[in-house]
């Protein structure tokens, strides 16, 4: 896998995320001329053999304009009503703009469960794959008409990253009113440096993410870095670029300022990609330094190295693994229910049968079901022959 930046036309499958503020004017509604210019860019990429998917914000912003809702934060039911109206307007706009290039648009509305529950994830992936096979451009958005505050992606940056990993894209482009990553907010710090290339998302890079989003959108640099962690861990490069100019993709190709995030050099399997990208782990295991060293060496997580079990989860659920520093270092599929995990935490594997009353697995999380997510690891644990088929979702 190359760590060098390539021209957009040299990628195989590209996911493009559009921020609400780019697509919708608070006073006049849809920015039709801008959308037409973007669709011309998409058509140009497709003509060069690139498959393109779009994650488009804007349904709520369009709906609130049509419904003449007041400025400021909306109540949940107001947001859902605005989304119901706006989704129709948004889908029609994309369909009309793409049709001028003889491209068919296909609308897909996702909820959190469509990427977090394995069976629904596979079904959504199959549907998107079929649309691409038929030559369509999938236009994807969160289904805000049914999403609640507690059960939602919350922003389309992370949704776009999950879509990118779902479909095996090799590039994610986040277009917004931000032209890339700076060492500090440039409007607050005149000495802030622009980062053209990010080789790895380290804690220092994460600390550079600041800033709240605009009223029309829910995203910000924080969510873009989160999206980058999901995408790059799965081997997908990411670009953050300004979408303000007409023909924003052509502008990137022409050398406009943007930040490029290099993909992880590690190969990924579809199943492990799903594990790594889970947005809402069901619980967590806090481990000691010795266990962390073992995981980084490609070993399974044994009960002896577990210091604390948090949350309520079942065997096979995705859980976060917290290192000695207190930061998440990995994710994996639980080998035991939370109650059983608490009973055997800190114990030797040989004691499991006596404690639980049956001879369970020796590992709390098997290496075949484990993905390192910390920057210093940032890799997938290699699969072994031992235990293959166990805990496969």
Swiss-Prot record:
Known EC number: 2.7.2.11
Spans traversing the lipid bilayer: none
Segments forming domain PUA: 282-359
Residues that bind ATP: 17, 176-177
Keyword Amino-acid biosynthesis in annotation: yes
Catalytic activity: L-glutamate + ATP = L-glutamyl 5-phosphate + ADP
Keywords for the protein's UniProt record, in alphabetical order: Amino-acid biosynthesis, ATP-binding, Cytoplasm, Kinase, Nucleotide-binding, Proline biosynthesis, Transferase
GO annotation, cellular component aspect: cytosol
SUPFAM superfamilies: Carbamate kinase-like (SSF53633), PUA domain-like (SSF88697)
Pathway: Amino-acid biosynthesis; L-proline biosynthesis; L-glutamate 5-semialdehyde from L-glutamate: step 1/2
Location in the cell: Cytoplasm
UniProt-recorded Gene Ontology molecular function terms: ATP binding; glutamate 5-kinase activity; RNA binding
A family per Pfam: AA_kinase
Domain of life of the organism encoding this protein: Bacteria
GO biological process, one term: L-proline biosynthetic process
SMART domains, A to Z: PUA
CDD domains to which the protein is assigned, alphabetical: AAK_G5K_ProB (cd04242), PUA_G5K (cd21157)
Role this protein plays: Catalyzes the transfer of a phosphate group to glutamate to form L-glutamate 5-phosphate.
HAMAP family recorded: ProB (MF_00456)
Protein name, per record: Glutamate 5-kinase 1
Organism: Rhizobium meliloti (strain 1021) (Ensifer meliloti)
Gene name of the record: proB1
